Amino acid sequence: MIHFIIGGARSGKSSYAESLAKNSGSDVIYIATAQAYDDEMQERIQQHKHQRPSQWSTFEEPIEISDVINNKSSSTNCLLIDCLTLWVTNLLCENKSIDDCKQQLIDALSNAKGDIILVSNETGMGVVPMGKLTRRYCDEAGWLHQEIAALADQVVLMVAGIPVIIKPISSNHQHKS
C-alpha cells in the first residue's frame, strides 16, 4: 500500500508518517533524502534521527531512491521516504534528468511490495515564484505530486498537525505481497 503524506513546513508530516510506519507491523526502513549543506540542516537531520526508533534501518540516499525501493521493498518491510521535495532539490542541484528519475521512481513504486510511505512538502499553495529556478522547482514538485497522488492508495494533507484525508483507502484495495 502506498501512503502519500503532504503538507506545509512544520505541519506534522514526518511525525504522522512515522506513526503510520510504527503501526504498520513491518520492519521499517527509513530512506532519508536530506543533505546537510549547513549547520541548521545538520541539526534538523540529527533531530529527526533521534526521534526515530533505534530498530529502524536508515538509508541516506539523496538521489537514487528508486534503487533503494527496488532492493528493499518486500511484504515484511515498510519503507518511509522523507522527503520528495528535498529529492527534487537534489536532482536540480546535480543537474539530473528529473523526468528520467521521476519515471524510475514511479516504476519502482508501481512494482513495490509491502507498505510505502512518502512524505513531501506542498509547494503549490502560494504565489507563483519570481525566480526561474524556484518556479521550475515548484513546477517539478507539483507534477511529481500529481503522479504520486494518482498512484497512491491514500493521500493525506497535514494541516497544523491534523491529518486531512484527501484520498481515502479504497475498500477494494488489494495489498501486494
Segment roles from a protein language model:
Residues 12, 36-43, 75, 79, ...:
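Residues at secondary-structure transition points
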Residues 25, 51-53, 74, 111-113, ...:
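Short, well-ordered coil/turn elements that cap or connect secondary structure elements
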